[in-house]
Amino acid sequence: LPSGRGFRIETSDGVVTADHVVAATGPFQTPVIPPVVPDGVINQIHSCHYRNPEQLEDGGVLVVGAGSSGSQIADELLRSGRDVWLSVGPHDRPPRSYRGKDFVWWLGVLGKWQMKTPPAGREHVTIAVSGAYGGKTVDFRRFADRGMTLLGMTQGFEDGVISVAGDLAQNVAEGDANHLGLLAEADAYVEANGLDLPLEEEAKIIGPDPDCIVNPLCRLDLAEAGITNIIWATGYRQT
């Protein structure tokens, strides 16, 4: 402000003044859609613009990206009765809760918040965790058991056909390893600190691979599959 004290902020809902401003914009600023499928070929939106199944065209949905946004959107679409394909890349898959404690609590006591930022050039994988429906651990095998088709990473597009990487089984297995690794760290912490927390052995059960993992698709013909929408849950870049 001209007085030198306070700030004048222009917002989408008008102008406000304040003595202090906290800039908590985080890294989620500019949505990123990879230049894979040309505009106009099919209805495409970024996950930041997704609100509910009713806003989409009738028909099946391909969700690209299986982090927290992609996995929760795919789950909601499946619950709504849509045919859903989910393109799964490398990811971490922490438990939503374990032994009566939320995963955020575990990340704190296990020192995960103090881990150093990965150096430039090292792959940073997404985290698949859900707060929907009371908060549940994301399990891609269970998605498939309910009728969702899992795919590897989306690689390209030509003549109406999506090309798919052959990395689905590896990505799911590495997510499982991350899940079990965090449970093991949590168990060790409980024992070392003499905590009285309930056992939760069922959290360590990994189900059998569904057919879409055993016999993964390497191509997906959108028209043949009845897919009329693509949701890109592919993250953001900082601006």
How would you label these PLM feature ranges?
Residues 1-239:
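Flavin (primarily FAD) cofactor-binding/catalytic cores of flavoenzymes
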